């Protein structure tokens, strides 16, 4: 991922602070699209804490000039909007969105799962698979690669579709989200509910 050798971090004479500076310099000077799998909920949090405790700017990868694609979120879209990606059905009868399961379902060798090197190789192969099989989802993910891009897309698009991380039906067919700083209010229609059953309903009926 970076040209920094792991052995130099373990056995080298640099401090943790120096390591944080080196990582910060690398990410600052290499403004590429960053891919991760569940990185929003895990990796970026760990990195922010690491930067903070070493006196570095913790939100380096959250600025408006950075693009981050979380392939777990792309997997939600692949599950709901495409038949091109294979999924393992778990014990609950639902499609498994674990990185290892997605890889195995699509013929990708995961090596030794949950080790840094093999997990990174698996991530790269899943990214290649998604780019080949569902390019429209990957390019849309890049278009929505940070919160500023998402807000712009939600304002500019007449219809904005997104996939929920959960697969169960929402309790209400219509949800209003007022996002601070946006010019308009966003209404989300849950398409798990048949729109014909409520599209002409009154506000009182919908609120039930």
PLM features per residue range, with description:
Residues 1-8, 25-135, 141:
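Metal-dependent phosphoesterase core characteristic of DEDDh/y 3'-5' exonuclease domains
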Residues 10-23:
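Glycine-rich, highly charged phosphate/nucleotide-binding loops
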Residues 13-14, 26-27, 47, 165-168:
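A short linear-motif detector with a strong N-terminal bias
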Residues 13, 38-40, 192:
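Short glycine-rich, polar/acidic loop-and-turn segments at beta strand-coil junctions
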Residues 143-207:
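Acidic catalytic cores of enzymes that act on phosphate-bearing nucleotides/polynucleotides
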């Amino acid at each position: 991922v970076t040209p920094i050798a792991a052995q130099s971090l373990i056995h080298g004479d640099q401090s943790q602070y120096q390591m944080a500076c080196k990582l910060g310099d690398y990410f600052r000077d290499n403004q590429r699209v960053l891919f991760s799998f569940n990185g929003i909920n895990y990796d970026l949090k760990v990195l922010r804490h690491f930067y903070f405790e070493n006196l570095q700017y913790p939100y380096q990868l959250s600025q408006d000039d950075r693009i981050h694609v979380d392939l777990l979120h792309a997997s939600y879209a692949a599950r709901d909007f495409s038949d091109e990606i294979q999924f393992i059905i778990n014990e609950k009868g639902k499609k498994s969105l674990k990185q290892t399961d997605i890889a195995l379902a699509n013929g990708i060798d995961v090596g030794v799962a949950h080790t840094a090197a093999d997990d990174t190789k698996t991530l790269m192969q899943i990214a290649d698979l998604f780019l080949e099989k569902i390019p429209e989802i990957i390019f849309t993910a890049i278009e929505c690669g940070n919160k500023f891009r998402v807000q712009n897309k939600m304002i500019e698009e007449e219809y904005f579709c997104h996939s929920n991380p959960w697969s169960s039906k929402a309790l209400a067919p219509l949800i209003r989200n007022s996002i601070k700083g946006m010019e308009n209010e966003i209404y989300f229609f849950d398409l798990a509910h048949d729109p014909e059953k409520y599209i002409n309903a009154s506000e009182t009926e919908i609120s039930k």
